[in-house]
Every structure is written in C-alpha cells, then in structure tokens.
Curated annotation (Swiss-Prot):
Protein family: Belongs to the inositol monophosphatase superfamily.
Gene Ontology molecular functions: inositol monophosphate 1-phosphatase activity; metal ion binding
Consequence of gene loss (knockout): Does not affect carbon mediated repression of qa-2 and qa-y.
Pfam families, alphabetized: Inositol_P
Binding residues annotated for Mg(2+) 2, in chain numbering: 115, 118, 262
Gene (UniProt): qa-x
Function comment: Part of the qa gene cluster that mediates the catabolism of quinic acid (QA) and as such, allows the use of QA as a sole carbon source. Its function within the pathway has not been determined yet but it probably plays a regulatory role. The qa cluster encodes 3 inducible enymes (qa-2, qa-3 and qa-4) catalyzing the first three reactions in the catabolism of quinic acid to protocatechuic acid (also known as 3,4-Dihydroxybenzoic acid).
Protein name (database record): Quinic acid degradation cluster protein x
UniProt cross-references to InterPro entries, sorted A to Z: IMPase, Inositol_monoP_metal-BS, Inositol_monophosphatase-like, Inositol_monophosphatase_CS
Induction: Expression is induced in the presence of quinic acid. The quinic acid (qa) gene cluster is subject to two levels of gene control: a primary system which responds to the presence of quinic acid via the qa-1S repressor protein that blocks the qa-1F activator, and a secondary system which represses transcription of qa genes in the presence of a preferred carbon source such as glucose.
UniProt entry keywords in alphabetical sequence: Magnesium, Metal-binding, Quinate metabolism
Length: 340
C-alpha cells in the first residue's frame, strides 16, 4: 500500500492500531520498571541492583535491554499487521552501519518512526519522565502520533484531521490562551542540555547555556536580550517536551540535536493541536524573515504552543511574534546533517 492509496478509512484503522500499540508498549515499559520495584521490595535490606545500560555515543547517550525489547515488540507488531510499511526505530538505526543510515525520512511508502523509550536516562533513575513514541508518516509527514508515558498515566494521541487528545477524552490544548504580549516574558520555556557536552567555547553546550541565560535574565539585561521567562524546564525527554507544549503547559520549546524518532509523534500531536513549529536557528533577518516549515530530520526545532487570538492579533500572529522574540535571544546551534 503506497501513500497515494491511504484512504480515510485506512488511516482510521491505522490510528486505532497505533493507539493500542502505544498502550501495549507502555505497559511493557511499566512492567520492566515494576520489576525493579518488586526486586527492591524483596531485598529491602540488601543493596539494590542497578539498572544496566550500554553507552552509545557518549556517557549520556545510553541504551538498556528494555529499549531493545520494546522496539522489537513494536516492530514485530507493525511488520505483522502492515508488512509493506517501512520502519525506522532508534535502536535499529543505531545498530546499522554509518554507510547505510538514512539521512532523512523521505520514503514515499508509509513509514513508522519509533522511539521505544525516550528518556532512557530518566528511566534508569526511575524519574517518571519517560515514554514510548510511535509515529506514522505519509509522504514523509507525520500524520499519526502516539506518546505513552506509563509512569505518569498519560497517553497523548493525534491523527490528522481528528484532533489531538490526552487519555483519549481530553481535547488538546487544555486551554487556548493568547500568547503573552511580553513574550517570551510570561512564558514557560522548555529546553534540554543535550548529549553534546564538548567543553568548547563555541560548542553547542556553551551556545545553549548562553541562550538559556538570555531567556531567563531580567528585561533589559544581557545587552537587551533578557527575556524574563516565567521558568525554564528540562524534562530529559524531547518527546514529552513536545507533548506538554501541545497540551499548553509549556509555551515554548527550543532544541537542537534530536532525531526523527524523538520528534515525529510529538510533531503530529503538536500540529493537530494547533501549535507552530519551525527551525531553532535564527535567520540573519530574524525580525522580517519568512517563518519556514520545519524539516523533520533537520535536528533543529522551535515550537510555540497552540494559542488563541487577542484584540488586534490573530493566534498565528501571536505565535509568529513569539518565535521572532525567541530567535532574537538564542544562538544558532551547530547540528548539521546532509539533506537537511
């Protein structure tokens, strides 16, 4: 089945399948976590065993057996139900050779993009901000997104034209308020430290920290770049950053370094809820440049929550104004990728 023959009825069926698959995969994550709880209860007076993991590209880029088991479960279910569909999973991709890794999702056939456990570091520390992320793409565009955060009891779902939902009953966003007139002032700003920790004055870590301080500093500070945001949040999960922006709990998410599986499901949910997503890196003419659509594989993302209109400003105008004010305060990040 090619994307040209994916009918509305078929998309509904795929959506139903994806939602159930997300629930089942979330249950597997929770079962693995509970096993650690039960082992600790049974051996309360003894030293607890630690969660074993393997480093990939760095000490903060890790994989557990749970990551691999859950991805294998998801991939098997998809291959059984939709054998003609393509599949890209984080762990499958990581194990492929550099020469065979695809740069971008440009498949003309329907494609599933999966992160079996986003927030692996959180999971190893039993911090509840971890989830499974499942996206379905048509012509390279996310049209279905499912994010299950089992320890939080939260399920985020969306299908193009059918709305975005929390736990299948609450429409997203929870509220649709205008963007603050002083944005980024009055906003909750979400960002991540990332996995690039190289100690270089012009490295991504330093650029991020400078941007964080600009966003947080008092108005008039930092050479006029002080944003005085209400707060800065870092969840350790790009997928959940997107979900909470779609929910309206975060006003802004700014990030570089993510991959397709980190963001595909969240983008589907965010856009269906009415959020706006573009490139994290500011153009030279940030005040007047056209705000481009994000490229899924670009690794550079700036997101503004769903918004409502205000007197004299449409919702879209408020979102675009906020994007420009963020661009004015952040550094360009160095995450290059062929084809992006």
């Amino acid at each position: 089945m090619t994307s040209r023959t994916t009918t509305a009825t078929e998309l509904d069926e795929i959506y139903t399948f994806a939602v159930q698959l997300g629930k089942d995969a979330g249950n597997l994550l929770m079962e693995a976590a509970r096993l650690r709880f039960s082992n600790n209860n049974a051996n309360h007076d003894k030293e607890s065993t630690t969660q074993e993991f393997t480093e990939k590209d760095s000490a903060v880029d890790i994989v557990t057996q749970t990551d691999e088991d859950v991805e294998a479960f998801i991939k098997s279910a998809i291959n059984t139900r939709y054998p003609s569909h393509d599949f890209i999973g984080e762990e499958t991709y990581a194990k492929s050779s550099q020469s065979t890794r695809p740069y971008l999702v440009t498949h003309t056939t329907p494609t599933w993009v999966v992160d079996p456990l986003d927030g692996t570091v959180n999971y190893t520390h039993l911090f509840p901000m971890f989830c499974v992320s499942i996206a379905f793409l048509v012509d390279g565009t996310p049209v279905i997104g499912v994010i299950c955060a089992p320890m939080l009891g939260q399920l985020f779902t969306a299908c193009k034209g059918r709305g975005a939902w929390l736990n299948e009953t609450q429409r997203l966003p929870l509220v649709r308020q205008p963007m603050p007139k002083s944005a980024p002032g009055g906003c909750v700003f979400s960002c991540e430290w990332g996995k690039d920790r190289k100690d270089r004055p012009e490295g991504n870590l330093y650029r991020k920290v400078e941007s964080f301080v600009n966003m947080a500093a008092e108005v008039g500070g930092r050479g006029g770049k002080g944003g005085m945001v209400h707060g800065v949040r870092s969840l350790g999960s790009a997928t959940l950053d997107l979900a909470y922006t779609a929910m309206g709990s975060f006003d802004i998410w700014w990030e570089g370094g993510c991959w397709e599986w980190d963001v595909a499901a969240g983008i589907a949910i965010l856009q269906e809820a009415g959020g706006l997503i573009t490139s994290a890196n500011p153009p030279e003419d940030w005040a007047t440049a056209e705000i481009p659509d994000v490229k899924l594989g670009s690794r550079l993302y700036l997101v503004v929550r769903p918004a409502g209109p205000s007197e004299g400003e449409t919702a879209r105008e408020g979102q675009e104004r906020t994007i420009r004010e963020v661009w004015r305060r952040v550094r360009a990040l160095d995450y290059t990728r062929p084809g992006a």
